[in-house]
């Protein structure tokens, strides 16, 4: 019987791969943290809290960094997180989408809400609905400039941000609206007690932020619009070939950002018990921290990549970090170092997004 002269196939690569040593637990953890932004942020959050606790016990802080202080810091967490979700929607739409006007929309919508409740005597619920519609209209102006007229979003929203800020200032001669009906809105954002001995938290965490987060998650993960939003942001050319309305998707993203800015405006009016014309632009403003939080949360600045969970945890990290900085430095030095921390976080998150993006492209080949 003739013997076969064929040689066994070269299995070096296959056998080498099969016989390769499995990655160590540390390597697997590093890979998880690189590709799962939520896991990385949770780890950083734990490290931050542990570090601040150590500084607290060592007497290096101006006050206690305890559960009550961290819960009180959620008051600034709510509007910032809502605006970061607004930025997520805009950035997801691609083509360098960004909205620099969200802080100005908070100021102008808050003033409009203050007029409705405090000056014109409107009931709360119609005023609330009108304020949200007003914020949506402001966002729609941005969407028209970007999606219809083709303006770069950076230029369009910078211009409208200037305009909205100016209108907020001149609407009441640069004075806040602090009449009794507006002051009564502070009840919307009062602290509420939690069971099991937990420290009280701001009411707006449950009444405003959680509904917004759930609705945005459902929008981007469970609707046709969400699928189109990711498709347009990932590859605009392919989306056009698939007959998707790229301009329509981008327009709606900016309009929804205006809607969320309106929600944040209502929250700030309640927090301050006053409609302030500089509520979203005073100091460091709200726009740049919101953008930083979105990028830190894993939203790719090129579009098409981002998760609601990452944005929420990133907002918590930024707020608790800022709260710790204020306890470490005396006087106004704390606010200046907050800017430094935001800059470092933005650079680090951009680098992480770039590395994660290269990993996704390698796996797609």
Language-model segment annotations:
Residues 52-53, 67-120, 146-149, 292-308, ...:
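Single transmembrane alpha-helix segments in multi-pass membrane proteins
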Residues 122-123, 138-142, 196-276:
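Helix-loop-helix "hairpin" substructures at the membrane interface of multi-pass membrane proteins
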Residues 276-343:
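Transmembrane alpha-helical segments in multi-pass inner-membrane proteins
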Residues 58-68, 173-175, 200, 220, ...:
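Inter-helical junctions in multi-pass inner-membrane proteins, predominant
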Residues 76-88, 104-108, 140, 159-162, ...:
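Hydrophobic alpha-helical segments embedded in the membrane of multi-pass proteins
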Residues 121-161, 313-317:
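Alpha-helical transmembrane segments within multi-pass membrane transporters and channels
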Residues 2-54, 234-237, 241, 245-248, ...:
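Cytosolic-side transmembrane-helix boundaries in multi-pass membrane proteins
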Residues 153-222, 252, 272-283, 329-331, ...:
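Transmembrane helix-bundle core of multi-pass membrane transporters
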